């Protein structure tokens, strides 16, 4: 059995390596899987939740998370790979206890000439109190499980759009890049690779800042308030017309 070989190797010269076990989340978890996890608990460092992160509905993914996480040990890292990985998917995964997330969102957008644009920083306590989850009469409370994963348009600036021909502002107000929208639009129109390099840099920076902000509010025990603030600030509560 493969895990037995892994156990032998880890007990010899690879004691510092990690063993990540892939578990399908789209099937009913039977006793074989739970027995395997229990038997090799000492060598399994993390669990990769496979079979999710594609085009499944919000309800399907939420149910899968709940089913699989109920039987997994709390002390194991949980991994997931998302074919998209937009901000709502990130918040949803962390909300359900996923530790490591591999998204494709920043790269996919850059490849297609698009930039991430979103409000990130809930700067003060007053903002946080406005979304206090203890107040049951608060209208600013949303269920992350009920939001549409695919409402990406709220986070995207499509620099292929001709409307940016004369727009000399930077990509976003919080971008690390100084190039203007009009310049990047020109590069895209000329099929210059530089445009995708600039957009990849921008998108990765924004996503890194996003994860840092999430980590900050988790440490401050304020993550649920941040979710509600993020939804409200980025107008994700509004239905598409």
Swiss-Prot record:
GO terms for biological process: tRNA-guanine transglycosylation. InterPro entries: Queuine_tRNA-ribosyltrfase, TGT-like_sf, tRNA_ribo_trans-like. GO terms for molecular function: glycosyltransferase activity. Keywords: Glycosyltransferase, Transferase. Coiled coil: none annotated. Belongs to the queuine tRNA-ribosyltransferase family. This is Queuine tRNA-ribosyltransferase-like protein. The lineage of its organism: Eukaryota, Sar, Alveolata, Apicomplexa, Aconoidasida.
